[in-house]
Structure formats: structure tokens, C-alpha cells
Amino acid sequence: GIGMGFQNYALFPHMTVGENLSFPLEVRGMSKAEREERVTRALDMVQMGKFKSRRPAQLSGGQQQRIALARALVFDPKLVLMDEPLGALDKQLREHMQFEIKALHDRLGITVVYVTHDQGEALTMSDRIAVFNDGRIQQLGPPPVLYEQPEDRFVAGFIGENNALRGTIQELHGDKALVRLDNGELIDATAVNIRERGQVTTVSIRPERVEFKPELMPKDAHTIEAQVRDVVYMGDILRARLRVADQDDFVMKYRNTLGQVKLSPGQSIRIGWHPEDARALDPV
């Protein structure tokens, strides 16, 4: 069968939580004992066992969504369709349920088609991700491929945080490109869907791949000037916003380690990256 998990819960208001979960099992002709066993197991999975006798109106929105999720899973379906089912849950429970759904998928071999606008959730849970834009699939592949090797500007900007620099292809040798930015500076990149010299391009670089320590940059790679706008402390990492190539929204992330160089607003630095981490994509 097919299990469904909706963003708007779709629970029967006149039934208790237990009856909501038992109903699809009863329709399938399961015995009362088996229904009760499956209902108990599904409620325990979403940490809602003590609410079995409540009605939906007596539950919070987050609790109702958890019940709806349990109902989608209660009969161990072969396929589950989910429309942002975890959107109403708090962060800790949402992360717990992500791994529970993934574990259920691995244990039972069910296929889950999962709609989400949370890119982190998609990267965490998926074997394959389909990125849609205007009803068309832009790219389909495993999470590491979509994140590390986006095929166009939309995917690069949609999956994870991303920097985009506009420029023109100065030199092109196979997939190795030299790009002249709009402010005249040169950077190295990997050509993706760019075919010829003189073509306008958007170069995509992930914030965590940007380096500012000379010893971490590849030899002979071009570096460019950056001015620090602000630095935000995020615990395990530091997030610096830079002015690069006349743009104020360039982001660099680096580890918060003992003895890490401290950057200050107004400071000028040189930044660079490995050419394979910068992807020359279709223009803006």
C-alpha cells in the first residue's frame, strides 16, 4: 500500500488518536490484536504513546503532525508520500524523526518520496534528491553530487549556502577556466555548462571551501582581495561576511579552532580556493 503524510495533518476529528491510526488497518481487514500492536508501535515511534485516547482537537499542531506521520507508517507500506511532515516539530524532535524515518526505510525497504524546502533535511535523509524549478527537474542525484557538483546556477544556489561571482571566461582549456570578474580580478574555476571564451558566467563557491591562509591555498592559484565586513560566532565555526569583487554578500566559513586567526571588520585579506571547488556555471 501507499502511506500518506500531509502538512495539514488530515486527521479525522471525531476519532481518537488510536482510532485514527487503527482505521486504515481496519479497512485492510486486520485483526483487532494486530491493529492494537501496530498502533502502539507507531505511536511509540513518534513518542506519542500516552495520547492514544485523545482527540485531535486536544493536541497541539506539532502533536497532530506526529500522529499523522504515525498513521502514514502504521501499516508498513511499500511506498510513503510525505509533504513536509516534520515542519511543525521542534528542532530536536525533527532531527530525531529524520533518523527514525531513515531507519524505517532501511529496515523495511520502503520507498519514501519526501517533499521538503529544508535543504539540510534533504541532504540528511535522502539517497537521491530531485531539485525542481518551475515544475521541471533541474538535477537528480545523490546528496554529495548535488552539493559538490551542481550542474547549473539554480541548483548551486538552492542546495546549501553558496557564493556567486559574475565574470567572463578569459581562458578555457578543457574543464579548466580562467575567469575575469567584473572588477577585473582573475580567478580559477572548473567549467561546467560553459563552452567558449568570452562567455559570461556565474562562478559558484561554497563558503567552507574559501581559504584565507596562504599555506592552505593551492600553489600558483589566483587569489583576490577581500575586505571583512563582519564575523559571526557560530560555535563550531566562524562565519565572515566579506566584500569581494564589489559585492558585500560573499561568505566564508572557517573552523573555530585553538589559535585560529581572528579577523576583524575592516580588515583586508587575500582569499582563494582550489579550482575544482569553484564552478563556472550559466550566467545570472
Give the role of each language-model region.
Residues N8, N20, N133, N162-N163, ...:
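Asparagine-centered polar/low-complexity signal
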Residues H96, P150, A164, T223-I224:
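Short, conserved clusters of charged catalytic residues that mark active-site
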Residues N162, E171-V284:
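Non-catalytic connector elements of ABC transporters
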Residues G1-G3, Q7-G157:
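ABC ATPase nucleotide-binding domains
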Residues G167:
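Short beta-strand-centered aromatic/proline hotspots
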